[in-house]
Amino acid sequence: MISKLKMPQPTVNIGMVGHVDHGKSTLTLALTGVKTDTHSEEIKRGISIKLGYADTPVYKCYDASGNPYYTRQPSENCELERVISIVDAPGHETLMATMLSGSALMNGALLVIAANEHCPQPQTREHLTALEIMGIKNIVIVQNKIDLVTRERALESYKEIKAFVKGSIAENAPIIPVSAYHNTNIDILFEAIEKYIPTPEYNEGSDPIMYIARSFDVNKPGTPIDQIKGGIIGGSLTQGSLKIGDEIEIVPGIQNTRGNKTVWTNVTTEVVSLMAGKYSYDMIKPGGLAAVGTKLDPFLTKGDAFTGRIAGYIGKVPPISFSMRLEAHLLKRVVGSDQELNVEPIRAKETLMFTVATANTVGVVSNVKGTDIEVSLKYPVAAFNGMRVAIGRRVLNRWRLIGYGVIESLE
């Protein structure tokens, strides 16, 4: 049985970002008690492939001397501060698009840097640039694996980190030394999270907008027809609220072929369950990650098929767009590669990758005028004017982050 309303809903999403194998999933486990890399291929390869997420309560407690400390496991003299959602993003270079789509849900980030490797590693640099590009300012740097190094190396690593973040969005971010494996300094990290990553102010009175990051079929093979559950969509509300019984629309919906034409049909359904972590709710508000049970055929939602879509009230979601005009802001250098390469100007007829909220789509540049670019998209997106869009280019057989654009118009 699912316990009902045992814990308040999470109010903030915190990204876990950094280079592959620097201990992000182990740190998520230390903070939440939840193992996020449970996908079969993730266990086999030892890396995160999909976005993982886990919730944890944060308690402020007082010891016998009256000194405060923070923990997820309360004893006497403890008060619940809030519940937080951790978004565990993959650190492997081939999975940068997944990390970027996750950044659309993040209100703050933990940048994990291993003390036993030189800083910066390629994806450390790439992920920090991604945070900068997506405007995520509330950052705590976690110097992990201090149990594997000498005191001298730990201090040297600290200096490398300070030099690396100088002049960046994380220049003044606190650096917390931890051993995620041994649960060392996790209480200090919780304290830093409470101090430096505040709960945002949400517009709960608006119509709901939910960015979908995952979608599932939770039915096991052989489930009797009368016991089959509808498709599940997972993501985060950025405004408004959703309750059981609400009729919702999902855009872009389903792709069909009619004759020689591809047609996209919006999907409508009813909310039948709402969950955050292991708890069920009658209503969810913005902040944190939630799983929304629907009456959709689970075949439609299986295998993250609805990732990148937007859900909201029927008729209150943005129309789908096959082209967009962006004001482009390019980086000076390509990040994420071992080689130092300059970012060339965007050219007409060039194919680029665009991360629009949780959606990744490829588009061809149809026109360039100064910093403005017009793009025809291979797959449509649901978006709003003014949104930031990450721009990637194929460099040395990998999609690399080259800058961002601000949406000026959509068609």
Swiss-Prot record:
Ligand binding (Mg(2+) 2): 21, 46
A Pfam match: eIF2_C
Region listing for G1, in residue ranges: 18-25
A cellular component term, taken from the record's GO annotations: cytosol
EC number: 3.6.5.3
Enzyme class, UniProt record, top EC level: hydrolase
PROSITE patterns: G_TR_2 (PS51722)
Binding sites annotated in the UniProt record for Mg(2+) 1: 25, 48
Region spans: G4: 144-147
Domain tr-type G residues, every copy: 9-201
GO molecular function: GTP binding; GTPase activity; metal ion binding; translation elongation factor activity; translation initiation factor activity; tRNA binding
Keywords, comma-separated and alphabetical: GTP-binding, Hydrolase, Initiation factor, Magnesium, Metal-binding, Nucleotide-binding, Protein biosynthesis
Positions of the UniProt region annotated as G3: 88-91
Region feature (G5): 179-181
InterPro entries per the UniProt record, alphabetical: eIF2G, eIF2g_C, eIF2g_dom_2, eIF2g_GTP-bd, P-loop_NTPase, Small_GTP-bd, T_Tr_GTP-bd_dom, TIF2_gsu
Segments passing through the bilayer: none
GO term, biological process aspect, one: formation of translation preinitiation complex
Catalytic activity: GTP + H2O = GDP + phosphate + H(+)
Cofactor: Mg(2+)
Region annotated G2, chain positions: 46-50
PANTHER family the record matches: EUKARYOTIC TRANSLATION INITIATION FACTOR 2 SUBUNIT 3 FAMILY MEMBER, EUKARYOTIC TRANSLATION INITIATION FACTOR 2 SUBUNIT 3-RELATED
Function: eIF-2 functions in the early steps of protein synthesis by forming a ternary complex with GTP and initiator tRNA.
HAMAP family, alphabetized: eIF_2_gamma
Subunit: Heterotrimer composed of an alpha, a beta and a gamma chain.
NCBIfam families, A to Z: eif2g_arch (TIGR03680), PRK04000.1 (NF003077), small_GTP (TIGR00231)
Name of this protein: Translation initiation factor 2 subunit gamma
